[in-house]
UniProtKB/Swiss-Prot annotation:
UniProt family annotation: Belongs to the WD repeat BOP1/ERB1 family.
Record-level GO BP terms: maturation of 5.8S rRNA from tricistronic rRNA transcript (SSU-rRNA, 5.8S rRNA, LSU-rRNA); maturation of LSU-rRNA from tricistronic rRNA transcript (SSU-rRNA, 5.8S rRNA, LSU-rRNA)
Function: Required for maturation of ribosomal RNAs and formation of the large ribosomal subunit.
Cellular component GO terms held in the UniProt record: nucleoplasm; PeBoW complex; preribosome, large subunit precursor
SMART domains from the UniProt entry: BOP1NT, WD40
Protein name per its UniProtKB record: Ribosome biogenesis protein BOP1 homolog
Disulfide pattern: none
Main location: nucleus
Source organism (scientific name): Caenorhabditis briggsae
Basic and acidic residues: bias regions: 15-36
Start-end of each WD repeat: 339-381, 383-422, 424-455, 456-497, 500-538, 584-623, 640-671
Length: 671
């Protein structure tokens, strides 16, 4: 049955614009629209967040650019189109951009986009910080001042001043229950204490009373205090092994020698024997004897406690001054004087000005050298090898005494220097009365051209002048009684002051101010008074073989060099024994020289060194003489017969040292 009804209004849905509902417009009670401001929602951080990949202008993706090095493009964009490579700039464009663009220095090339990116000030500052080793963050200070909140200031009030709770002052009920249970267990006998350990019986100490110091007397305490342990037995050596090496076993000759020797003379008190195994070694038959001798040694041999002084070795060395404070002394090799062939055995310097140097060598020549230039200005050919030369100490005479092999001594006129002095020397040689000598004289004088020649009975080792220049002495090489002769030039006479042999004479020298003669044998030096012909003093040198001798300017000190490598300083006013004995050389000392003006002393040796000493001699008896080594000089080479430096002398006015060598050279050392 159809019924009629009124049509109900159908509610239609409002169309959405752009798929969104239109917001309702708020109205008031009268139906008028209200002016409502929209509420701004907080922005979502993911709406504006973007990664580095999304910010790239070249959206080819995060792929290596080198994949497209051989292609004409650098990738594809989001639409699939090829992205062409940007055109490369030429050198001219790059140069123009560098000149015209003021921001060129802050641009970098970005491989991802293929373009130049301009760096900001913040980025540049970060780069500078990284390059200089600083933190990249701008303005970051890693050393901020530490703010000590609690201990920087002294507080008078506590930080937490809450009062103690009341429960702290009330006894604990739990503890009360525990104590009551323990008391009840003790009353009932349930609580048991720790078990007592059974004491084990102790061993009786037999020596307890010996160790106790209660009943020890004072004498026993003193003996205990100074007790010295017995020396230990020496450890066995290889020879005492049951299987020693073959070199420790005796052969027939050594066995016979050991059996024939006395017990005290034997190096070993047993004969080494060899066994293959330790089980084959028999019982030692001398065991009880050695133990008994050991007991006798401990019982009879007294022991002595030696107090050792623990001192630093450097404290025992004397304090040496700075060598720079002791200058001048020779330090540098100035030049060599070459001309001799073979050994240069002797040299002598003109004693007043030191302008001339005379040298004699194994080649039989005597050469005169200019000291300033080292040039040889004159040469004398002798009839034998020259052994000694000596300039006359008189200033106005150009005399030179030369000893050479063939048993001759010659007095030469060097012919060098002042012409007036040369003429006076020629006149002196011509006026020497060689014809007035007695018949049968041991030493004969004769004139030969411009020189005097003395025929000696033996080969001459050395010639030396007296300070006044009229007397000179000669020493023979042979060990005979008449080995020393004193010659007087003004009378052309020679005499032997010693008729008895006192030893093998090695060197002689005159006292510089008195009529005395020093004669050096191998181990002694004797001082003779020539005026009274008596022995003044005999000196004990301590050398085993004296080789050279020299005196100071006053004749109060004597300097000796020996073939036993020793150098001795004899102070004649202190006694007959050396004041100083030094052993700075490793070979024989050949010559000693003392400077006339400076406190300098020199020794030369076969080890190829010349030792220079600072030798100060005081006239004040309250001061001791000073001797300090200051320099070691080297200039000559050692020959096959182990000879090197043979002679030395000082320049009379300068601190210059002249040395001769077996290599045929003459060396001059200056400061």
């Amino acid at each position: 049955m159809a019924s009629t009804s009124t049509a109900l209004p159908v509610r239609t849905k409002r169309k959405l614009e752009n798929g969104k509902k239109k917001p309702k417009t708020p109205k008031d009670e009268f139906g008028e629209k209200l002016d409502v401001k929209p509420v701004i929602k907080p922005a979502d951080e993911y709406d504006y967040d973007s990664s580095d990949e999304e910010d790239l202008r070249n959206t080819i993706g995060n792929i290596p650019i080198q994949w497209y090095d051989d292609e004409d493009h650098i990738g594809y964009d989001k639409f699939g189109e090829k992205i062409a490579k940007p055109a490369k700039k030429g050198e001219i464009e790059t140069f123009l951009e560098k000149m015209e663009d003021p921001d060129y220095w802050r641009k970098v090339f970005d491989k991802q986009t293929g373009t130049d990116v301009k760096l900001t000030d913040e980025q540049i500052e970060k780069i500078h910080n990284i390059a200089s080793g600083k933190y990249p963050t701008i303005g970051y200070n890693p050393y901020e001042p530490f703010l000590d909140i609690y201990s920087s200031q002294k507080e008078i009030h506590p930080i937490d001043n809450r009062p103690e709770p009341k429960a702290r002052f009330i006894p604990s009920k739990d503890e009360m229950r525990m104590v009551s249970r323990m008391v009840h267990a003790i009353k009932m006998g349930w609580a048991k204490g720790p078990k007592n350990k059974k004491e084990e019986p102790k061993a009786y100490d037999l020596w307890a009373s010996e160790d106790a110091l209660d009943n020890v007397t004072k004498s026993q305490l003193s003996r205990m205090r100074v007790h010295m342990p017995a020396p230990k037995v020496a450890l066995p050596t290889h020879a005492e092994s049951y299987n020693p090496p073959e070199e420790y076993l005796f052969d027939d000759e050594e066995r016979k020698k050991w059996e024939e020797a006395e017990k005290e003379d034997r190096v070993l008190n047993f004969m080494p024997s060899k066994y293959d195994a330790l089980r084959k070694v028999p019982q030692y038959d001398k065991f009880i004897t050695e133990r008994f001798e050991r007991c006798l040694d401990l019982y009879l041999a007294p022991r002595q406690r030696k107090m050792r002084i623990h001192a630093d070795p450097t404290d025992l060395l004397p304090d040496l001054p700075n060598p720079n404070d002791l200058r001048p002394f020779p330090t540098t090799l100035a030049f060599y004087m070459r001309g001799h062939t073979g050994q240069v055995r002797a040299i002598s310097v003109e004693p007043v000005h030191g302008e001339l140097l005379a040298s004699g060598g194994e080649d039989g020549t005597v050469r005169i050298w200019m000291m300033a230039t080292g040039r040889c200005i004159k040469t004398f050919q002798m009839d034998g090898e020259v052994t000694s030369v000596a300039f006359s100490p008189v200033a106005d005479r150009t005399l030179l005494a030369v000893a050479y092999e063939g048993k001759y001594v010659a007095i030469l006129n060097t012919g060098c220097g002042d012409r007036l002095h040369v003429q006076q020397t020629e006149t002196l040689l011509a006026e020497t009365p060689t014809e007035s000598q007695e018949d049968g004289a041991i030493v004969t004088w004769r004139k030969s051209k411009d020189k005097l020649v003395l025929k000696m009975p033996n080969e001459v080792r050395q010639v030396t002048w007296h300070a006044k220049g009229d007397y000179f002495a000669s020493v023979a090489i042979d060990d005979i009684a008449k080995s020393v002769y004193v010659h007087q030039m003004s009378k052309a006479k020679s005499q032997c002051p010693f008729q008895k042999r006192k030893g093998h004479v090695q060197a002689v020298t005159f006292h510089p101010t008195q009529a005395r003669l020093f004669v050096a044998t191998k181990i002694h030096v004797r001082e003779y008074d020539l005026a009274r012909c008596v022995l003044v003093k005999k000196l004990i040198t301590g050398c085993k073989h004296i080789s050279s001798m020299a005196t100071d300017a006053n004749g109060e000190n004597l300097f000796l060099g020996g073939l036993d490598r020793r150098f001795c300083w004899m102070d004649l006013q202190m006694g007959n024994k050396p004041w100083k004995k030094l052993k700075h050389h490793t070979a024989a000392v050949r010559s000693v020289a003392y400077h006339k003006k400076y406190p300098l002393l020199a020794t030369v040796s076969d080890d190829g060194t010349a030792m220079v000493y600072y030798a100060r001699i005081y006239s004040d008896f309250s001061k001791d003489n000073e001797l300090y080594p200051v320099k070691r000089l080297r200039a000559h080479e050692r020959t096959s017969n182990d000879l090197c430096m043979l002679h030395t002398t000082w320049h009379p006015t300068q601190p210059w040292l002249i040395t001769t060598g077996a290599d045929g050279t003459i060396a001059l050392f200056t400061y």
